[in-house]
Amino acid sequence: MASVTLIRNGIVLPMEGRRAVFDPGSVLMEGPTVVAVGEVDAVDAHPLAADAEVVDATDHAVIPGLHNTHLHSGLLRGTAESMALWEWLEAYVDPAHKALTPEIAEAASRLAYTEGLRAGTVSVVDMWRFMEGSARAAEDIGIRATLVPYVADLPGYDYFETLESNLALLQSHREAADGRVRTWLGLEHLFYCSPEAFARAAELAGEYDTGIHTHSSETTWEVDESLRRFGRRPIEEFFHRGILGERTLVAHCVWLDDHEIELLAETGTSVAHCPCSNMKLASGPARVGDFRAAGIHVGLGSDGEKENNNLDLMEEMKFASLLAKVSALDPTVGDPWDILEMATLAGARATGLADVSGSLEVGKRADVVTVDLRRLHLTPVLHGPDFNVAAHLVFSAGGADVDSVWVDGRRLVVGGEVRSVDAEAIRTRAQEAAEELFDRRRALTET
């Protein structure tokens, strides 16, 4: 018999598109599925099994789990600071890729997924290497993961993944762990992949009905270089190569012109917005308001641990709003409800999971987060016409305020502690793996 959990008497923000609030409200889960959402009395009217778990959510916000639409697992946190993007890639990131082993890569994914889950993330799109280990990590931890191997085939990048290895992972992990673990096709960058790789990826995406993920237009240099090499701006070149479409998710998209925005909108291509990374690397502010106005699905991404430097999507929401405001010199943009939508339902739409996750609705999977509002920095909590919890979640709360996380109805975080795996063992192994990685990297650069 399926387990039953009632999250009762919280402040429920379902994020189903209507800005509804049930205050107080409840969420009833049966097995992996949401079976009731609403006011306390309405949900209480549902029959409850004698062995049902009842979680008292008084003074807690109850929201859908967060969707991280662009992540790189890694172990370079706190290194290569205060450097320009392409200098940083060549000096630190690419040498680390050369030194990477499957064992180190798996340790990095276990660290990233555990860190994200602890902070309320239920789904990640991870572009990484040796991703059989990432699949094991996601299955053990319980998080949803879209695995996107770094594919590169141009000269000088032979240490990345290939379309052949990506296809092998797609065939073995197309829909694994009861659908929680999926594989997409990953094209590292326009300057790392040949036109033939783009064409083959588009062909495979259609054949396997799967997604494509890549980076674009993170810096002005990329735009200028694309014009020099191809005579087209990056998104125009993507269109020319045939990869734009409803299956495609493009990270960053900072320096797009009006025509490129039109191309994304017309083709149904989605965007992963990474505000912390774009600020830290001084890449610039993406035109998120224009994207959304054009009907483009825009999700939030943390990017990697080295360019953020954490994987806290609660914090990412605050920076997404503040970056929008200061770049437009307009305090009315970056509305908390819009930002919450980007982190939940819009992120699920951008990654093809909106039928499954992203909002608290009957029939969807029970991906739920509770946030403890009994904090100095979250006081006062106001109700009715003065309701301020949406603003608190975006501007005041952080991942450390997350109390519990359910994925597919399984409670993976309880009282702020990850229960599905031994988080301390994962941290210890990641520390060892990082030391090994830097030793290997040093040996390679000294030869």
Provide a role label for each language-model segment.
Residues 365-420, 427:
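C-terminal cap of metal-dependent C-N hydrolases
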